[in-house]
Amino acid sequence: MGKYLTSPPNLTGMPPGVPYIIGNEAAERFSYYGMKSVLTVFMAHYILNQSGVLAPMNENESYMYTHLFVFGVYFLPVLGAILADGFIGKYWTILSLSIVYCLGNLTLACMATSWGIAIGQRMMLLIGLIMICLGAGGIKPCVSANVGDQFGESNKHLLSKMFGWFYFSINAGSFISSILCPWFLANPKWGPGWAFGIPGIAMLIATLFFWGGRNKMVHVPPAGLGYLKQTFSKEGILTLARIAMVFFFILFFWGLWGMSNGAEWTLQAEKMNLHWMGLNLIAAQVQTANPILILIFIPIVNYILYPAIDKVFTLTPLRKIGIGLFITAFSFVVIVMIQGWIDAGQKPSINWQLLAYTILTLGEAMVSITGLEFAYTQSPNSMKSSVMALWLLTVASGEGFVALVNKWILGGGQKVSAYQYFTFFTWLMVGAAVVFTIVACFYNYRTHLQSQLTADEVATEPILHGGTPS
C-alpha cells in the first residue's frame, strides 16, 4: 500500500479520487436499483417452477421477501465496516466484494436459461440475492466513508456539496435503470434474463471504473486489531450509542421509503389509471419519479429552501432530518387516500401517486442526504465505516420491521386491508417524528475529519480522537 496516498493532500479544490468514487457509485446504484425495481414484480408475476410453469408468489409473500432482501443488504454493512476499518481497508473491501456482487447479478440473469429453470428459479433467486446482499451490503459503508476520506481541513468546506453530488449520482443511476429494467421485464422479446442481466453489466463497469482510480484515491490504512479493541471499549460503545440514539427513529423513515421503491406502492399503482400525459406507463416505472425528483430537489433544498428557513431559525442537521420525517408522514396520507378510492371500486389517476412521490422525495432530500453527512462528520476517524454501517443499519431495521409486519399478516392469517396497512404506517411515522424531535434537542455535535498527516503520523494518532472536534 506504500505507493498510495494514506492521508488527504493539502488541496483547496475537489480531490482527484472523487470522480472515480462517484462514477463507481452511479453505476453500482444503476445495478442495484435496476434489479430491485423488477424484483417484487418478478416474484409476483413471472417466476416459474422447475417444470417451466408459472408459479408466482402472492402479494404479501413477495413484499416479505423483498423487504428481507433489503434488510440483508443494509444489515451486512456491519461486517463490511469491520473488514474495512479493522483489517484490509476500504479500497480492498470495496474491490473484493464488488466481484461477489457481480457474481450475484450473473446468477439472477441465468435464472431465465433452460438450466436455470431446471435447477429452480427460486433456488437461483435465493443464491443470487444472498451474493448481492454480501456484495452490496459489504461495500455500502465503505463507499460513502471512502469518499469522505478524500477530504481534509483545507477543503472540508466542499464536503457538504460533495455528499450532495454523491447522492445525485445515486439517483441518476437509479433513475435510468428504473426505466429500463421494468421495460425489459415486461417485453417478451427480452424478459427476466435481460431485466436482471443489464444491472449485472452495470456492476461490472462500476468495479472496473473504481479499480481504474486506485492511484488517484487516498487509501486510509486499517487500524488493525486495535480497531476492535477500541470500538468495543467503553468509550467506543458510548460513541456509537450516542449516535445510535439519533439514528433509531430514522429506521421508520426507511421502512416507509422502501414501500415506494418497487414494493407496496408499485402494486398499488397496478390498480390505478396509468395513462399519463399521453403515455401508458408500466406500474414498475412509476417509481422513477423518485430519482427524477431527487435530482430536482437537491439544488432546491440546498440553495433555496435551507437558506430561507435559516432566516427564520437556525437549521441544524437534526432539524433538517426532523422536518423531513414529518413530510414523509404526509406523503403516506396521500397513499391512504388513494387506497380508500381503490377499495371503493374507483381507479384513481396515477397523478395522485406522483403527488405522494413528490412529497416523499422532498422528505428524503432532507433526511437521507443530511444523514449521510451527519454519519460521516460525527464519527471518530477510525470508525468512519462503522458509523456509516450504523446509519445503513437503520435502513435494514426499517425494512426488517416492515417484513415482520407482513410476516405477521401472512402467518397469523390476519385480515388487514391495504387501507388499514397504510394507515398504520402513517401514524407510526408521525409518532417517530415527534419523539425524534424531542431526542434531537439533547444531542451535542462533535465533528471529525481525516487529518492531513503523513502515514507515520496517522499511525500514532489516538484511534478515537482523530480529526478536529468542533
At which residue positions do the language-model features occur?
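C-terminal ends and interior cores of transmembrane alpha-helices
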Residues: L97-G120, F326-G345
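Central cavity-lining transmembrane alpha-helices of secondary-active solute carriers
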Residues: M64-D85, A172-F175, T288-Y303, S397-G400
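C-terminal transmembrane bundle
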Residues: N280, I294, Y303-S451
